[in-house]
Amino acid sequence: MHTVKLLCVVFSCLCAVAWASSNRQPCHSPPLTSGTMKVVSTGGHDLASGEFSYDSKANKFRFVEDTAHANKTSHMDVLVHFEEGVLYEIDSKNESCKKETLQFRKHLMEIPPDATHESEIYMGSPSITEQGLRVRVWNGKLPELHAHYSLSTTSCGCLPVSGSYYGDKKDLLFSFFGVETEVDDPQVFVPPAYCEAVAFEEAPDDHSFFDLFHD
């Protein structure tokens, strides 16, 4: 009888832990983050690698591709103001700019509010000092894009670790390295003066952050 009672108590506790985990609310990114972001296709093709900066309060994102990356004739430099729904493609060498509308504003720098907490796991070793990292795994759907995603963040601090996007058009894998909770130059979120007079180009309603990365 005591054994049965003990098993019931243990089972109840495990259920409570599982319920609490599945109902965990999405964490929020620090006000400012920066570091290196690499994007590859699930087929193993390198799509982009460079420095990112993110302002979570203003929901602004800048990504400047490493000019040494691959054998490309042009390299990505994009600024996205998600709240305003504006995407800038910047060519600082020629001082030219392309400005597009962005109707779909979800992205993997911020966990969507309707994301589901999947699990909390250790990467590496939990028992050896400085040899492990505890991360939380979140996932969800993007029905407007006929896609779904998964995003891993640090348990303490909500820093991005990795992400994946699976859609009808493409599958993408994101990795983040050397992430800091600061941005050296806040001006990276301000479009260059030569972008001001550029007219908007209307983009489809399903045009998204994920369309930036392609073969």
Swiss-Prot record:
The lineage of its organism: Eukaryota, Metazoa, Chordata, Craniata, Vertebrata. The keyword rRNA-binding does not apply. GO terms for biological process: cell-matrix adhesion. It comes from the Eukaryota. EPDs are synthesized in the meninx and secreted in the cerebrospinal fluid. This is Ependymin. Its main location: secreted. It comes from Cyprinus carpio (Common carp). The keyword Metal-binding does not apply.
